[in-house]
From Swiss-Prot:
The keyword Zinc does not apply. It comes from Salmonella typhi. It is found in: Cell outer membrane. This is Outer membrane porin C. Residues 1-21 form the signal peptide. Belongs to the Gram-negative porin family. Pfam families: Porin_1 (PF00267). InterPro entries: Gram-neg_bact_OMP (IPR050298), Porin_dom_sf (IPR023614), Porin_gammaproteobac (IPR001897), Porin_Gram-ve (IPR001702), Porin_Gram-ve_CS (IPR013793). It is a multi-pass membrane protein.
Length: 378
């Protein structure tokens, strides 16, 4: 019986962190769920910047209220607290915080810190035990979590076509000190006004296909030609993404390809020790593919390949790195689920990047990393 229960629970746990939430309140059309996890995590690597304790915890809530038979209000908040720092470091941040209204089959609208519509497709490959999703990041235009998202979502195309979902999104300018870190918003985390949309279709028999397009204005800091360390220049940051997914019969296969213009970043621009070079590739080709299998007794092995190839990486002073790999690795890992609340995993990132002038100047790690984690979630 335990084996059968695990085979049903594990796929649900992989959908979202809140899938395993604890119901706190459910009465008179009002519902509140609490969710969270503690990840006792350690990295082993020759890279001193990666090696060591990486323990963290996340906690959040999801709530909804039934206004009437056609209108529902909802909200969600999620927070991350690092457990590998001293008590006075205050190293924590808000991952998401938004509120919205759902109008029956007419769709939903929400505003706040949320996920960009590009992630509607790229999330399909962001399922590795620890690593993954490296070809983009938080506060990276409209590619993942960010501030000031106004999002309209429609499920099953107004209730007329099962599995056909679409979203339209606008993001306001973020150039001030905010975002998902305690160091403020560096130019690599800034964005101008942006908009985009996504379309996904669950074809049936476990197959899904999707695509997304976003375009954002770039800020003055991001186009500051007087900064010799800054690479990449352009009025807009544009992303085109397509993906495929198969999720059935204990098999999970997914792939996504993105082509970006002035949007794929590298290096570090904030803090007291920025990298020698940082900025955005004028063009980048990003590819992620993953394969997993869920055994009935709780084991889920995983293998993946990720690559981000930057094209024409140059600055306003005539310096150029040409075409360079920003991310390139094979990932082999496995997760074992003791039950719906407890799991452990190992994830081996086999780095395929070579040390060269670009990786050294941008501070990009070229060493392998092995991650070991023990997770309690609710």
């Amino acid at each position: 019986m335990k084996v059968k229960v695990l085979s049903l629970l594990v796929p649900a746990l992989l959908v979202a962190g809140a899938a395993n939430a604890a119901e706190i309140y459910n009465k008179d059309g009002n519902k509140l769920d609490l969710f969270g996890k503690v990840d006792g995590l350690h990295y082993f690597s020759d890279d001193k910047g990666s090696d060591g304790d990486q323990t963290y915890m996340r906690i959040g809530f999801k709530g909804e209220t039934q206004v009437n038979d056609q209108l529902t209000g909802y909200g969600q908040w999620e927070y991350q607290i690092q457990g590998n720092q001293t008590e006075g470091s205050n190293d924590s941040w808000t991952r998401v915080a938004f509120a919205g209204l759902k109008f029956a089959d007419a769709g939903s609208f929400d505003y706040g810190r949320n996920y960009g519509v590009t992630y509607d497709v790229t999330s399909w490959t962001d399922v590795l035990p620890e690593f993954g999703g490296d070809t983009y990041g938080a506060d990276n235009f409209m590619q993942q979590r960010g501030n000031g998202y106004a999002t309209y979502r429609n499920t099953d195309f107004f209730g007329l076509v099962d599995g056909l979902d679409f979203a339209l999104q606008y993001q306001g300018k973020n150039g001030s000190v905010s975002g998902e870190n305690t160091n403020g918003r560096s130019l690599l985390n800034q964005n101008g006004d942006g908009y985009g949309g996504s379309l996904t279709y669950a074809i049936g028999e476990g197959f899904s296909v999707g695509g997304a397009i976003t375009t954002s204005k770039r800020t003055a800091d991001q186009n500051n030609t007087a900064n010799a360390r800054l690479y990449g220049n352009g009025d807009r940051a544009t992303v085109y993404t397509g993906g495929l997914k198969y999720d059935a019969n204990n098999i999970y296969l997914a792939a996504q390809y993105s082509q970006t213009y002035n949007a794929t970043r590298f290096g570090t621009s904030n803090g007291s020790n920025p990298s020698t070079s940082y900025g955005f590739a004028n063009k980048a080709q990003n590819f992620e593919v993953v394969a997993q299998y869920q055994f009935d007794f709780g084991l889920r092995p995983s293998v993946a390949y990720l690559q981000s190839k930057g094209k024409d990486i140059s600055n306003g002073y005539g310096a150029s790195y040409g075409d360079q790999d920003i991310v390139k690795y094979v990932d082999v890992g496995a997760t074992y689920y003791f039950n719906k609340n407890m799991s452990t995993y190992v994830d081996y990132k086999i780095n395929l990047l070579d040390k060269n002038d670009f990786t050294r100047d941008a501070g990009i790690n070229t060493d392998d990393i092995v991650a070991l984690g023990l997770v309690y979630q609710f």
